[in-house]
Amino acid sequence: VIRVSLTVLGVVLAACATTASMPEPPEGRAIYMENCVQCHGPAGKGDGPWAAAMAPAPSDLTQLGVNGDFPRARILSVIDGYDRTGLPGKEMPEFGALLKGETVPLDVGDGVLTPTPRPLAALLAYLESIQEP
């Protein structure tokens, strides 16, 4: 009886536990439209309203996944500021809000699930969804 009760209790607790769902591209698109569109443009082509005044021009974000290889770790490091080239004009603005809040387990290509701020993971999902051949 005790074993059955513990099993039932375990099932009930498992059903009650909430797990963070992985962000989908539409969630990331909203973040993109709020933070990235001025430089990278509405379609991610690097042609936003501020792009003409920038040197070098913003990257075409639809071409990040060359040959079907989407470099998740590299893209995250550029967005969050770890990948600074030191070259003038290559800096991304600071996106402090993208680095806060709930985290989700994200595999950036090395097979390791890394706790990643949900907004950052959502933006990554959106960028991956707009890749062109």
PLM segments and residue spans:
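Sec-dependent bacterial lipoprotein signal peptides
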Residues: 1-16
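Electrostatic cytochrome c docking/interface patches
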Residues: 15-31
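Detector for the c-type heme attachment site
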Residues: 19, 39-46, 97, 128
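An acidic site on a long C-lobe helix of protein kinase domains
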Residues: 24, 71, 115-119
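The canonical Cys-X-X-Cys-His
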Residues: 28, 32-42, 92, 123, ...
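Sec-exported extracytoplasmic/periplasmic mature domains
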Residues: 33, 37, 80-84, 128-132
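Extracytoplasmic electron-transfer domains, predominantly the class I c-type cytochrome c fold
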Residues: 53-112, 123
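C-terminal partner/receptor-binding element of secreted or periplasmic proteins
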Residues: 118-133
